Amino acid sequence: MSQRFDVIPLFDSYQPFYALGRGELFPGDIPAVKAFVESLEDVVSESINDYRHVKDFLWSKCRRSEATYNAFRSESERFLLWAWCVHGKSIAALKKRDIEAYIDFVVSPPKSWIGTQVCRRFTVKNGLKEPNKEWRPFVAKISKAERKESLKRASRKEVQPDTGNYALSQKSLQEVFSNLSVLYNHLVEEDYAFGNVVSAVKKASPHLIVDVSNDSVKRLSALQWEYILESTKEKADEDPVWERHLFIIASMKSLYLRVSELSFRPKWTPKMGDFYREDEDWWFTAFGKGNKKRKVSVPVDFLEYLRRYRQSRGLDGLPAVGESSPLLHPIRKHNPGLQARTIAMIAQEAFDLASDRMSKDGFRDDAKILLATSTHWLRHTGASMDVESRALKDLSADLGHGKLSTTDKEYVHADDKERAASGRTRRV
């Protein structure tokens, strides 16, 4: 296979894509996309029709959520590029063996298709958008722990990802199958494809590992959480800038929030007025996955962190009814709040602070785990710690789970506890 990379991204980001309108096929401000797709007609006669149907799929299936759009765009885009530029076929003509070949490709793509960092798809030049030459359909990554450890070494040079070490996780492979299946269901509904063979390919795939274990979600230990909370609180006592750090980690752990539920998005900007009182109880309105609002109970102990964060911003007491102040004050004044990536970076600073203190106190293994911790661990930590003291239906409602069984599966591991207890005293 050629090591040249001569393909381009096909679809713009969420807002420009939907601003284009369903009736417009190609974006007028990105002439390179139209030229690229049309240039392939000599090899794949249905390239324009392929593009049209995938664009319509993204338009109809992903409008409600930018995250959903991004996930399906990435998979649909590289699937089209592979079908046209590597396999030389229309996606409407692909059979079972072709999909198997695509899965092999995704698991082990050529180095020329792999980047070492996430890049913008397009750059602006003279009022028009051009394909970013640094963009690649696949990205090799290194763990946060490896990156942090590299900076601690004497060279102080941050280790860079190696395209030769690209590896697709089992979770990502599952998502490839899922996204492809949804795409083909749409193509079949539109009479553009004759059938959906993705599930059959998945069932026989040698790349998928069947996991029969009931793996628990990633969470922090009580000791790790204590270090994060106390070290961040002490830092905030010294420097008011850290009050935002403290409020973020306390909110995500105590209210079981996802990072997106604290961030501003096109359809939602979290405000202080999302906290409200009913009788003697406080609640928080979260706007979560699937564009669904949910009502989250607020523990009394959390109100201390809400008060001190508000005080650091010059706001009185607890939120007033309908208060429009942004929930998280922005770094840039023109923004209505903080974006998810910025919130994650702030939380990581708290994790790093706690990691340093744990390491100095001799808890080096625990400290290393904190280097790899993500914000989502806080949500899982809060739920895991509370599951034994709260009614499962109440915890499930606060988490925003549609089914009680989801909460039970993720956070109740009675069988594992009994199994671990019975095996703890085995002799070597």
Where are these regions (language model features)?
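N-terminal core-binding DNA-recognition domain of tyrosine recombinases/integrases
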Residues: 53-70, 77-214, 234-235
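Short, basic (Lys/Arg/His-rich) helix/loop patches that form interaction surfaces
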Residues: 344-397, 404
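Conserved tyrosine-mediated DNA breakage-rejoining catalytic core shared by Y-recombinases
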Residues: 264-308, 314
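Short, polar N-cap/turn motifs at the start of nucleic acid-interacting alpha helices
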Residues: 269-275, 389-410
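Active-site/catalytic core of tyrosine-dependent DNA strand-transfer enzymes
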Residues: 300-369
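DNA/chromatin major-groove-contacting recognition/catalytic segments
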Residues: 397, 409-428
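Short pre-functional
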Residues: 181-185, 243-263, 283-284, 385
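Basic, Lys/Arg- and aromatic-enriched nucleic-acid-binding interface segment
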Residues: 170, 226-259
